[in-house]
Every structure is written in structure tokens, then in C-alpha cells.
């Protein structure tokens, strides 16, 4: 989230501490905060960290479950406002495997008139990175690491399995 926030405008501000005045930084007065959109359920694990960086950001949710036969996302929840009027968005999804969920979320956000869309991940597969790029629905993709490849059932290798299952203790 820090890296995805890199291009937000900042301004210097005066800060008074108990030991004396100093200069700090703040988001610029004209900076429009991105809408944070965790892809449920795994994206919930990234939301607290994103709100620690951008505490005044609004949040919307997109609930997607992967169809294990087609590997495509099925929507079960969408609380994103109907018209974002160009507001920037950060999609929070810890794993970018096939990119089906990220592409679907980004297309839904485009349909709601989102501004710049940044997909923020912890772990990605090269196939997912390429699929997201080819889809053209996201303006940027930020990931902490890119693993080797996808296996025959669309999981990242070596990866960590299902990120939501890991977070919520499901076997």
C-alpha cells in the first residue's frame, strides 16, 4: 500500500511537538483519496494495513468466489458505490494467480466510472501479471513478490495455497 500510494500528492505542514516545532508531510489538500476495495474474503487481511496508511479513505467491498471448475470468479457481493465519478481505487487482493478475480473487480469498477485503478497484491504469478496487463482494466499493479508459475488447478507455485483459507484457519 505504501508503494501504491507513492504518487499521491503531499504537502509540507508545520507540526508542533512537546519539544518544539518541526516540519511534517500530509496528503495535499487537493488529493483525492483512493477508494479501498478488498476482494473478499482474502483481501480483508490487507484492509487494516491500507487503512493505517490512508485512515480517511472510504471502503467498498467486492465478494468473489472462484469457480473451481472454470477458475472464473462468481460474484456474491458488491458494495461499491454506483458512480465513482473518477475517484481513484486500490483493489486489495493478496494473491494474483489467474487474475480472474482482479480483472472482474477492475471491470466492475470501470463500469462504476472509477478513475485510476491500482491492484495491490502480496504474491503474484507471472501468468496472472500478464493476464491483468493484457486485459487493460487496471492502470497499475503493485506486488511484493512474483512466484514461479501456476499449477494445473490455477494455484501459485510455490505460493501458499488459498490465502483466505490461510487467514481464517480453513483446511
Q: What do the predicted segments below correspond to?
A:
Residues 1-171:
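PRPP-associated nucleotide enzymes
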Amino acid at each position: 500500500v505504501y508503494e501504491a500510494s507513492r504518487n499521491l500528492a503531499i504537502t509540507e505542514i508545520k507540526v508542533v511537538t512537546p519539544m518544539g516545532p518541526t516540519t511534517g508531510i500530509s496528503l495535499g489538500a487537493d488529493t483525492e483519496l483512493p477508494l479501498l476495495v478488498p476482494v473478499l474474503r482474502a483481501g480483508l487481511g490487507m484492509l487494516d494495513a491500507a487503512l493505517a496508511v490512508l485512515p480517511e479513505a472510504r471502503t467498498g467491498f467486492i465478494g468473489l468466489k472462484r469457480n473451481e471448475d472454470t477458475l472464473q470468479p462468481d460474484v456474491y457481493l458488491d458494495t461499491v458505490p454506483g458512480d465513482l465519478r473518477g475517484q481513484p481505487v486500490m483493489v486489495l487482493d493478496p494473491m494474483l494467480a489467474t487474475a480472474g478475480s482482479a480483472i472482474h473487480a477492475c471491470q466492475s469498477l470501470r463500469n462504476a466510472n472509477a478513475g485510476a485503478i491500482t491492484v495491490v497484491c502480496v504474491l503474484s504469478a507471472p501468468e496472472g501479471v500478464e493476464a491483468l496487463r493484457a486485459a487493460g482494466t487496471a492502470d497499475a499493479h503493485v506486488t511484493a513478490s512474483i512466484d514461479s508459475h501456476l499449477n494445473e488447478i490455477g494455484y501459485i507455485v510455490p505460493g501458499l495455497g488459498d490465502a483466505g483459507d490461510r487467514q481464517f484457519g480453513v483446511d
